[in-house]
Regions:
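N-terminal secretory signal peptides that target proteins for export/translocation
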Residues: 1-7
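Alpha-helical and His/Cys-centered functional microenvironments
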Residues: 10, 33, 365
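Bacterial N-terminal signal peptides
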Residues: 10-21
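Boundary at the C-terminal end of the N-terminal hydrophobic targeting segment
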Residues: 26-30
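A short, flexible low-complexity segment enriched in Lys/Arg and Gly/Pro that occurs
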Residues: 34-46
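Non-catalytic cap/lid and distal C-terminal segments of serine-dependent acyl enzymes
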Residues: 46-50, 54-56, 62-387
Length: 387
């Protein structure tokens, strides 16, 4: 493992919010008929969805440029202009946290030893059961993942700290927002752990296995293999109270963030997702959850007692629509997130749902506009332990 650290300066680092969750353009074709990547046509731009479409949730439309209040619950529509919030710019008069980086090798993992698809190959829809994806080119393969750990300047060594775990790291936008929000006492003094994925995307890849699997496996990986390293390397003490633990991610990283809490409410109670992949993307197929993360709004949340989970979620009006990937009618990200809002409301969850106009999948501008409010909303009601 390699590790190093740097002190965040007064310049906003070029954050990467490309949390990729889309499927390849020709995913429904047999792999042996796939043309070279360079010859495949580009995926058409998704249609722009109207937030007032019949069947969508009833939502409060905010003036352009505004975001909901940090204590507001329910459904909101934000306008087409997405300026970065002031908290997304590093301030010279604000204490800057330190970001440490280290790498993890698949050779050291008992939970995720590593898989990958052959280059330029994808799955094909099962001709008998359109809800299944057939992948024949996935094989064991090693990987190295990067982990970034943000420790705020206000952290007192030895004190138990709340924390947030993020997918598809490193997420430097998160670290900048936390610097400013912590300084303004709008969120608790917390550690942020931004974990890189194990490479690839979608069915048959390591990232797909980690993020799209409907189980507590990824939460267990974080608990058993990541958090102990964070504590030992950087001399921080992470809380074991699920009220002081949050997860976040975009696309498949978003559905993964929910899975971490859903399957392990003993570990996490707070979830934040951008363009969550609440669609049928799980592989390998699991008869217990045959429709993958589409099952959250289809059966799991409606048919289960409400869990102690607080969730903030967002979708863009031009978010992903992949109707031909598996011909299962379960690959519309806008519909999936709209239905998430419906079932969360019906079950009495504390949630805030944002429908963003003029926004694509895991839209960077939307994240820069909304992340400070989202984080402040996420940590509402948290009571830090007595000093």
């Amino acid at each position: 493992m390699k590790n190093f650290a740097y002190l965040k300066g007064a310049v906003l680092f070029g954050a990467t919010s490309a949390l990729i969750g889309c499927l390849p353009p020709a995913l429904g074709q047999p792999t042996n008929s796939m043309p070279p990547v360079s010859e495949r046509p580009k995926r058409p731009t998704p249609p722009t969805r109207d937030p007032h479409t019949p069947g969508y949730v009833t939502a409060t439309e905010l003036p352009d440029g505004e975001v909901p209040a940090a204590d507001a619950e329910g459904n909101f529509i934000i306008g087409a202009t997405h300026h970065a919030a002031p908290e997304m710019v590093a301030q010279t008069n604000v204490p800057q946290g330190t970001v440490y980086n280290f790498t993890m090798s698949s050779a050291d993992s008992k939970i995720f030893p590593g898989i990958a698809r052959d280059p330029n190959t994808f799955g094909t829809g099962d001709p008998i059961d359109p809800t299944r994806m057939v992948v024949t080119t996935s094989h064991p393969e090693a990987y190295t993942r990067r982990v970034a750990v943000y420790v705020p300047q206000q952290y007192v060594p030895g004190r138990v700290a709340p924390f947030i775990v993020g997918a598809d790291g490193p997420d430097r936008m998160l670290f900048t927002a936390l610097d400013n929000l912590i300084a303004e006492h709008r969120v608790p003094v917390m550690i942020a752990i931004s974990i890189g994925n194990g490479s690839g995307d979608a069915q048959g890849s390591e990232r797909g296995l980690e993020y799209d699997t409907m189980s507590g496996r990824y939460a267990e990986f974080v608990e058993q293999e990541v958090l102990p390293l964070v504590e030992s390397k950087y001399h921080v003490t992470l809380t074991t109270d699920p009220e002081g633990r949050a997860t976040m991610g975009g696309s498949s990283g978003g559905s993964c963030a929910l899975s971490m809490a859903w399957y392990h409410t003993d570990l996490y109670h707070r979830v934040l997702t951008y363009s969550g992949t609440y669609v049928n993307q799980q592989w390998p197929h699991n008869e217990e959850t045959p429709h993958g993360a589409w099952g959250y709004h289809e059966t799991l949340i409606p048919n289960s007692a409400a869990k102690p989970i607080r969730i903030w979620l967002e979708v863009g009006d031009r978010d992903l629509l992949n109707p031909n990937s598996m011909h299962d009618n379960m690959h519309d990200w806008v519909v999936a997130n709209e239905r998430m809002a419906q079932v969360l409301a019906a079950k009495g969850y504390h949630y805030q749902f944002i429908f963003a106009r003029n926004a694509g999948h895991t839209d960077r501008a939307v994240k820069q506009q909304t992340l400070p409010e989202a984080l402040e909303w996420l940590w509402q009601g948290y009571q830090p332990p007595a000093k």
